[in-house]
Amino acid sequence: TGQKMWISNAGFAKLFIVFARIEDDKNITGFIVPNESNNGITLGDEEKKLGIHSSSTRQVFFNETKVPVENMLSRRGSGFKIAVNSLNVGRIKLAAACLDAQKRVTSYAVQYASERIQFNTKIIDFEAIKEKVAIMATDTYVGESATYRAAKDIEDRIKIRHDSGNSFQESELKGVEEYAIECSLLKVAISEDMQNIADEGIQVFGGMGFSAETPMESAWRDCRIGRIYEGTNEINRMLSVGMLIKKAMKGHIDFINPATKVADELMGIPSFEVPDLTELFAQEKLILTNLKKIFLMLAGAGIKKFGDKLEEHQQMLLAVSDILIEIYMTESALLRTEKNCNRLGKETQTNQIAMTQLYLYKAVDIIQSKGKEVIVSFSSGDEQKGLLMGLKRFTKYYEYPNVIELKNIIAEKLKEENKYCF
């Protein structure tokens, strides 16, 4: 007996997966419940939503609904674990779904900009529009790189567990669970990229973008739920850092030793030698390594300062999570682009190289901003000066990329193909 809100597909579902508490059990249990009106099940009216109008969303009311014991999903009291794992799967699936929408919206924007003429010039030839479509494409490429990476990691982990004698079901559960952090990071990054891309798509369309007759209006409304689905982005941000710290505390990953090495490095004299940057991505790899040091520096200092009460400092966790997101997304794009350069030849990957370099440049800006925010929040005096100097050292470029040129390169390829083409 009870009610559930915001149930997707409730209007036509034949079966419900319901999580409920049996009597005074501490933990919840999962059930398979047929949607039968003669068994105490009634539905509320269809919700009037901001977006996703074609989906059915209703309340479900249970009034002394009888559920046979054989309809229990797994074991009694194991519902929370099932629910959490379904969220992990849902998060990476949401990321993949958003990516398809990002590609379509980017293509719509490029096609409209190639047709719309202002001052006797197609607006795709204006640098203000080139910048927009280049960033839209870059965020899509990077998000896709990270999603493929996580999906392959999960697939490999499932196979390893299955080959070791685990059942396929157990292998899937554990495989996804081991990459729960990555699933959360992807969900946050890509749902927010989707929102930004839809917003910029409207801007490219101008006044027409505000019309319900163009595809941008529904894209903007429909994508807003992505930041709320499968746990809000704020919850997922804090979860990702929290899970990482818990893994370190349990000894599942070595976090303390690398953090200590970074702290020791900060105490030493920095090298002023200019490294050899002739090899492809030499500078990008060096910067990426240093960005990881920033995360270790800040998370290590936070743990040292607050211990197990770090979770209470939510703004700090949110900022550190943003740093973690940028590191994972940047590394994913770099790995993909480098692999394809080696496989297909560097000359075939000009635009992908440009997108990787452009994204890293943006990531460094974000990490500098978030890093300062975190450092100033919990430190003072010499400690603060040391951490800020470390942040400056670890975000150093030896040769700054020409980001305007990078954006123009990407935009010209989009114009040539008249769609998202990467």
Describe the function of each predicted region.
Residues 3-5, 9-11, 110, 114, ...:
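Active-site beta-strand/loop segments that form the cofactor-binding cradle
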Residues 11-13, 25-26, 55-57, 87, ...:
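Short, solvent-exposed loop/turn segments at the edges of secondary structure
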Residues 197, 208-281, 379-422:
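Glycine-rich phosphate/cofactor-binding loops in nucleotide/flavin-utilizing enzymes
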Residues 22-27, 103, 107, 111-124, ...:
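Secondary-structure transition/capping motifs at alpha-helix termini
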Residues 141-189, 202-203, 307, 329-361, ...:
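C-terminal helix-coil-helix/basic helical segment that borders enzyme active sites and/or dimer interfaces
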